[in-house]
Amino acid sequence: LALGINAGVGNLGVSIIYLTAPLLLGWNLSSFFGPGLQSANGGLLYLQNVCFFWAIPTVLTLVLIWLFMDNLPLPKQSPKSVLSIFGNKHTWLMCWIYTCGFGSFIGFSAALGLLVSKEFPEVSFSLAAFLGPFIGAGLRPIGGWLADKIDSGSRVTLIALFIMLGASILVLMGIQSHSFPLFFGAFLLLFLMTGFINGASFRMIPYIFGNPFHSSLVTGFTAAIAAYGAFLIPKIFGWAYSSFQSVAPAFYILIAFTVSTIIITWWFYDRKNSGIHC
C-alpha cells in the first residue's frame, strides 16, 4: 500500500500536465516569460509557460528533500551481489509484467491524444485527456491495498490483466465502429486496470526475492524498463498508421503482449504448483 501511494502520487504528474498544459499554453504572460510561437491556426502558443509553472513545485520539492529526507544506512554490497539480479529469471519476468502495467499506463498516456486526433478528429479532447492518467494513478494504491487484503498480488494482477485484455478489444471495436463513447469508456477501463496492475505487481517483488536489498534493486530496474513504454507504444501506433493506414495492427501486438503477460503471471506466480506465493 505504501509503495502504491508513493508511486501513485508520482504518476499523477502525467494527469496534472494534461490538465494544466492546454490552459498554460494559451495564457499570455509574454511580459514575464517572452513571446509566444505562431500556431497552425494563427493563434499563439506560450510553450515556456509550462516549464516555468513546473519550476515552482520542483523548487519546493528540492527544499523539502533538503530539510526532511534522510539517507537510511544500508550494509555495503559487492558489485557481484548487485549484478546477481540480472541472472535471476524472475527479474526479467517482473520486468515483463510491470511493463504491461506501468509501460501501458505511461505509453497510453502519451499516445491517447494521437489516437483521438487520428480516429475522432471531430472530438475536442484536450481538456479531457487528463482523465485516463488520473484514474490510472489514483487506482494504483488500491491495487496494492487489494493485494495486501487478499494476500496475493499475483491474483489481483491476473484478474486485472484479463479485464485489460477485454478493454483492449473494446477499444479496437470502438475505433472500427467509430463510436467515441465506446472507445473512450474502454480506454478509461484500460487505465483503471493499469493502476491495479502497477500496485499489485510492485507488491509481488518483495515476496519473490525475499532479500530487501535485491527487492529494492529489482523494483528500481523494473520501473526503469517499464518506462520505455512511453517511447514504444506511441512508436508502435505511429508505425501502424504509416505502414497500414490503420491502428488495428498496433492493437493486435498489444493484445498479444497482454495474453503473454497473463500466461507468465499465471504459470510462474498464480497457479497452485508455481512454488511462489506473492
Model-derived regions, located:
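C-terminal membrane-cytosol helix-exit motif in multi-pass small-molecule transporters
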Residues: 26, 54-75, 264-268
